[in-house]
UniProtKB/Swiss-Prot annotation:
Summary of the function given for this chain in its UniProt record: Involved in transport of phospholipids. Contributes to transmembrane flipping of lipids. Required for secretory processes during plant development. Requires an interaction with an ALIS protein for activity. Has activity with phosphatidylserine, phosphatidylcholine and phosphatidylethanolamine, but not with lysolipid. Modifies endomembranes in multiple cell types, enabling structural changes, or signaling functions that are critical for normal development and adaptation to varied growth environments.
Protein name (database record): Phospholipid-transporting ATPase 3
Subunit and interaction comment: Associates with ALIS1 to form a stable and active complex. Interacts with ALIS3 and ALIS5 in a heterologous system.
Organism: Arabidopsis thaliana
Extracellular side: 90-93, 320-346, 921-934, 1007-1013, 1064-1076
Active site: D413 (4-aspartylphosphate intermediate)
Annotated knockout phenotype: Impaired growth of roots and shoots. Roots devoided of the characteristic trans-Golgi proliferation of slime vesicles containing polysaccharides and enzymes for secretion. Aberrant trichome expansion, reduced primary root growth and longer root hairs. Impaired pollen growth. Impaired ovule development. Reduced adaptability to temperature stresses.
Organism placement in taxonomy: Eukaryota, Viridiplantae, Streptophyta, Embryophyta, Tracheophyta
Length: 1213
């Protein structure tokens, strides 16, 4: 049913039934919000609408589409299309080579890829069957009947038991809990393991037993299926009564029921229309910069191929015209007088002959190398293993390994990324009086920078210290607040902390044993503070909050008070505040509000200027101490005003369109004329090793930007504490807290405020840019840093100022953006990525960092305290910020070096091989006669030179891991792209030309007139086999010359490849076929090996061909060394004991930590219980495959993760 023009639902319209519009998986249709009508417990009424079934399919193929669709996927690669065209050409009469030469390698590559696709899809199919055949109880004829998930339909009444998974998106109707609530774990959706509370409408509480549930005939008018996990708008119509629905009543597929015996609900969305399946869209596809440059190299090679073919075509036309009498071509039926036709056909003949210049095995080899790098090196590096949380590093994609070695800009969140996200209530301000005596880590760092010695803290007698509470001030403890100048405000602050939140208490209702389940550590810290101040929040129902208050009426008296929660105005990134309207037992109505200081100050009542001024000073002091601040306010409401407002609130809450916007507008009507209570200050300490890590990364040439939602003072001091900013730097500060902007805000004209801020931002940007450019042109000028707040950033990102902002930022070593929204984080990242064309990396730990992580070239997720959304959206996951040192300076740099060398080696060996064919065409009048046997040409890439390059890509190390971190400046070579420049390509191309000339000319010239042991002159196949043997030896030994770190695997693969060629030659040349009678390949190797000339050539030619490379490397090392070569020389005489290990981490862990790590790496069956690795003991990740490699998030991955169910612990009776 679609109605686009109204916000409310007319109950008379609920009997109309029109087909519901649906949305296919992964494609959210851009359409105006509409709604659907679902008839509960009435399949016949729902049947005409034809809602989607609950069966899901996450496979990519079926029996009929596998081959065509699989081949289509493979031929999306331009290289495969190229080889397909070459294979087709080789089947025509103009081809000088057998089709097997090109068809066999292409078929091998395609077969391996298709087998991989088939295996992965088969696993998905098996998983789909397991999920679709899971059972759920539905209501049929007044009793619960068990059916498979796939048979579930929209409108069915279902019963979900404790620890069971929701099979569809369900409207929560009733619960075994007397207060109509249930507890839900959403780990499969967002990784958060803290329980969420869901509330059924009181009108549906009675529909719990099958007899009562059978009587339920409600109608659900709700939004169309969409991918928003955290929103839901709709109405429930029961007996002509319309009740608004919210996300509190929706139980999403994939979540599990906890701490509740069972619940009853009505199915709203099924199958691919559930919210989690609608979210199952592919993550942004990322390709490394080096891979994009590889495409350009391939195009260049193709141009070289075309050039060679054009030379051959032109040469053939000329030679044929001059030599046609001798060749007798004028008597032929073919019209060879037409030079254009001769050139045309010769061109395509030579294309098939020279096709091997583009390596078919390049992409397969690189994928294999990257895969092993990820699974065996990054995932198993104990230097990046966090023993405290049993969390190893994990590469969720292997596509971007080498990108880690070229990062120039890092964009970092602060909370939970640079800091621990372990919040502790530290200080507060009440009624203009500051409380709290502690010294923060930031203050200690400031003192040390000024040469002051900080004494150890002397805590007061009886000071309380527990998780979330590190407050020391006897004036507020144990009822002493009653003697303060503002005891009433103290009482209001404590009540605000105890009431205005969404925290869920668990466990015994005693202060020592209770556990608070909070959406964020801040919330938990504030409620814990209220408890220690004597206002103990111990129980919650959908409509009540219970607080045990001490010392309120008189000293020492304890009383339990029940506060009725009438309305909750929820926090979001736009409002930046949260409010509750509550009724005291005596009937008093109060609005409590907490939020960002600038938001609260804008809504204060008149006459509070003095308190506001003092509180602002306290906030600035708290911020300069590195504390996170929050302001609190309240307002008494009279019943008439509240009733009038509540009607508007209910209307907004019942709206089906723009509900969030309408609720925000209604909230503005009551969140004004507030009385300021004070502020709180929470300490979030730096993570271990952050300052050292940042200093190391800065030495590596990486510029670090901090993007945070904290106030400017807090952000600046955190930046100081972690060595991002120091006193030697010149700071540019662009803030909205200027006199001109404040005056404009006081006048209240929004248009004028916008104009003034934009002008101020433009003026500051211009002024700062001029100073920055002048400073950069000054000899030994100071390093620069920029600090800008979110309000100014909004205008600085305007197209008219964006270029100026970018220019200033790129001149700065460090940038701090404070008070920024998630959108602004992504905008800043995109600005540098696209505007500066620099390699960017974003790192964060929360849902608000996802857009920033996806906007960067490389996204890093911190598996921290804020769920796993950041990890889910990331390319790599680590547990601590300090692990970036190893990830970038060791693995990133090595991967970049290795992939560069692999690509260059492939380019070199294929060009060398093809050029020998090209030189041979000059001897054959450009006729297209092939130089090598078809099988020689087919197996050159895939067998005889395949393994050594893979070993190079896995084990190449210029310096050890410890030296990589000791000399972070080495990383700059990756930033400069030193190993993949066109100059490097030219050097390798020159080497290929030289070696091909040596191998071809030496053998062909020296064999002229030479005879074998039978007295016969060497023929074509004798010479070509000799050249081929020299090539195989030379290009394989070249691997040893270019390797900085040679292992036994290098010798095994190089020797094995040469041996493989000789064994193949012995077997192949010993087989007589009808084809061989014409080609004369039969017995060639045996004839050659019977001559001294063969052994002399094999010894001399490879040495001469490699001599040029040897001399060049020596000259380069002595006169034009790379940075890593200088480091090698410095440490050349040191012990090589540490070089045996890939990573020097063998003795880093205690036996217990090593055991935990080993357990975390064991292959295991994928869990069906929860969704993410290491989020709590006994839980494992649906993302973690048994090999430990993480693919980019695909539709089927999300579907599989969110649709799992737990195995029953005991057999069902």
């Amino acid at each position: 049913m679609v109605r686009s023009g109204s916000f409310s639902v007319d109950s008379s319209a609920t009997h109309q039934r029109t087909p519901s519009r649906t949305v296919t998986l992964g494609h959210i249709q851009p359409q105006a919000p509409t709604y659907r009508t679902v008839y509960c417990n009435d399949r016949e009424s729902n049947q005409p609408v034809r809602f989607k079934g609950n069966s899901i399919s996450t496979t990519k193929y079926n029996v009929f589409t596998f081959l065509p669709k699989g081949l289509f996927e493979q031929f999306r690669r331009i290289a495969n299309i190229y080889f397909l065209g070459i294979s087709c050409l080789s089947m025509t009469p103009i081809s000088p080579v057998s089709p097997i030469t090109n068809v066999a390698p292409l078929s091998m590559v395609l077969l391996v890829s298709l087998i991989k696709e088939a295996f992965e899809d088969w696993k998905r199919f098996q998983n789909d069957m397991s999920i679709n055949n899971s059972t759920v109880e539905i209501l049929q004829d007044q009793q619960w009947v068990s059916i498979p998930w796939r048979k579930l339909q929209v409108g069915d009444i279902v019963k979900i038991k404790k620890d069971g998974f929701f099979p569809a998106d369900i409207l929560f109707m009733s619960s075994t809990n007397s207060d109509g609530i249930c507890y839900v774990e959403t780990a499969n959706l967002d990784g958060e393991t803290n329980l969420k509370i869901r509330k059924a409408l009181e009108r549906t509480w009675d529909y719990l037993v099958p007899e009562k549930a059978y009587e339920f005939k409600g109608e659900i008018q709700c939004e169309q299926p969409n991918n928003s996990l955290y929103t839901f708008t709709g109405n429930l119509v029961v007996q002509k009564q319309t009740l608004p629905l919210s996300p509190d009543q929706l139980l999403l597929r994939g979540c599990s029921l906890r701490n509740t015996e069972y619940i009853v609900g009505a199915v709203v969305f099924t199958g691919h229309e559930t919210k989690v399946m609608m979210n199952a869209m592919n993550a942004p596809s990322k390709r490394s910069t080096l891979e994009k440059k590889l495409d350009k190299l391939i195009i260049t090679i193709f141009c070289v191929l075309v050039t060679m073919c054009l030379i051959g075509a032109i040469g053939c036309s000329i030679v044929t015209d001059r030599e046609d009498k001798y060749l007798g071509l004028h008597n032929s039926d073919w019209e060879y007088r037409n030079g254009l036709m001769i050139g045309f056909f010769t061109f395509f003949t030579l294309v098939t002959l020279f096709s091997s210049i583009i390596p078919i095995s390049l992409y397969v080899s690189i994928e294999m190398i990257k895969f092993i790098q990820s699974t065996q090196f990054i995932n198993r590096d104990l230097n990046m293993y966090h023993a405290e949380t049993n969390t190893p590093a994990s590469a969720r994609t292997s596509n971007l390994n080498e990108e880690l070695g070229q990062v120039e800009y890092i964009f970092s969140d602060k909370t939970g990324t640079l800091t621990r996200n372990l919040m502790e209530f530290f200080k507060c301000s009440i009624g203009g009086v500051s409380y709290g005596c502690g010294v923060t880590e930031i203050e200690k760092g400031i003192a040390q920078r000024h040469g002051l010695k900080v004494q150890e803290e002397q805590r007061s007698t009886g000071a309380i210290r527990e998780k979330g509470f590190n407050f020391d001030d006897p004036r507020l403890m144990r009822g002493a607040w009653r003697n303060e100048p503002n005891p009433d405000l103290c009482k209001e602050l404590f009540r605000c902390l105890a009431i205005c939140h969404t925290v869920l208490p668990e466990g015994d209702e005693s202060p020592e044993k209770i556990v608070y389940q909070a959406a964020s550590p801040d919330e938990a810290a504030l409620v814990t503070a209220a408890k220690n101040f004597g206002f103990f929040f111990y129980r919650r129902t959908p409509t009540m909050v219970y607080v045990r208050e001490s010392h309120v009426e008189k000293m020492g008296k304890i009383q339990d008070v029940a506060y009725e929660i009438l309305n909750v105005l929820e926090f979001n990134s736009t409002r930046k505040r949260q409010s509750v309207v509550c009724r005291f037992p005596d009937g008093r109505l109060v609005l409590y509000c907490k939020g960002a200081d600038n938001v609260i100050f804008e809504r204060l009542a008149n006459g509070m200027d003095d308190v506001r001024k003092v509180t602002r000073e306290h906030l600035e002091h708290f911020g300069s101490s590195g504390l996170r601040t929050l302001c609190l306010a309240y307002k008494d409401l009279n019943p008439e005003t509240y009733d009038s407002w509540n009607e508007k609130f209910i209307q907004a809450k019942s709206a089906l369109r723009d509900r969030e916007k309408k609720l925000d507008e209604v909230a503005e009507l009551i969140e004004k004329d507030l009385i300021l209570i004070g502020s709180t200050a929470i300490e979030d300490k730096l993570q271990e090793g952050v300052p050292t890590c940042i200093e190391t990364l800065s030495r590596a040439g990486i510029k670090i930007w901090v993007l945070t939602g904290d106030k400017m003072e807090t952000a600046i001091n955190i930046a100081y504490a972690c060595n991002l900013i120091n006193n030697e730097m010149k700071q540019f500060v662009i803030s909205s807290e200027t006199d001109a902007i404040r005056e404009a805000e006081e006048r209240g004209d929004q248009v004028e405020i916008a104009r003034v801020i934009k002008e101020e931002v433009k003026r500051e940007l211009k002024k700062s840019l001029e100073e920055a450019q002048h400073s950069l042109h000054t000899v030994a000028g100071p390093k620069l840093s920029l600090v800008i707040d979110g309000k100014c950033l909004m205008y600085a990102l305007d197209p008219s100022l964006r270029v100026m902002l970018l220019s200033l930022s790129l001149n700065c070593t460090s940038v701090v953006c404070c008070r920024v929204s998630p959108l602004q984080k992504a905008q800043v990242t995109s600005l540098v990525r696209k505007g500066a064309q620099k390699i960017t990396l974003s790192i964060g730990d929360g849902a608000n960092d996802v857009s920033m992580i996806q906007a960067a070239h490389v996204g890093i997720g911190i598996s921290g305290m804020e769920g796993m959304q950041a990890v889910m959206a990331s390319d790599f996951a680590i547990a601590q910020f300090r692990f970036l040192t190893d990830l970038l300076l060791v693995h990133g740099r090595w991967s970049y070096l290795r992939i560069c060398k692999v690509v260059m080696y492939f380019f070199y060996k294929n060009l060398t091989f093809t050029l020998t064919q090209f030189w041979f065409t000059f001897r054959t009048g450009f006729s297209g006669q092939r130089f090598y046997d078809d099988w020689f040409q087919s197996l050159f890439n895939v067998v005889f030179t395949a393994l050594p390059v893979i070993v190079l890509g896995l084990f190449e190390k210029d310096v050890s891991a410890s030296l990589s971190k000791r000399y972070p400046e080495l990383y700059r070579e990756g930033i400069r792209n030193s190993f993949f420049k066109w100059r490097v390509v030219a050097v390798w191309a020159t080497s290929a030309v030289y070696q091909s000339l040596v191998c071809y000319l030496f053998v062909t010239t020296s064999s002229f007139g030479a005879v074998n042991s039978s007295g016969k002159v060497f023929g074509l196949w004798d010479v070509s086999t000799m050249v081929f043997t020299c090539l195989v030896i030379a290009v394989n030994v070249r691997i040893l010359l270019m390797s900085n770190s040679i292992t036994r695997w290098h010798y095994i693969t190089v020797g094995g490849s040469i041996l493989a060629w000789l064994v193949f030659a012995f077997v192949y040349c010993g087989i007589m076929t009808p084809h061989d009678r014409n080609e004369n390949v039969y017995f060639v190797i045996y004839v050659l090996m019977s001559t001294f000339y063969f052994y002399f050539t094999l010894l001399l030619v490879p040495i001469v061909s490699l001599l040029g490379d040897f001399i060049f490397q020596g000259v380069e090392r002595w006169f034009f060394p790379y940075d890593y070569q200088i480091v090698q020389e410095i440490h050349r005489h040191e012990s090589d004991a540490s070089k045996a290990d890939q990573l020097e981490v063998e003795n880093e862990l205690t036996p217990q930590e090593a055991r935990s790590y080993a357990i975390s790496q064991l292959p295991r069956e994928l869990s069906k219980h929860t969704g993410f690795a290491f989020d709590s003991p006994g839980y494992e990740s649906f993302f973690a495959s048994q090999l430990g490699i993480y693919a980019p998030q695909k539709a089927w991955d999300v579907a599989r993760r969110a649709s799992m169910r737990s195995r029953p612990k005991v057999p069902k009776k």
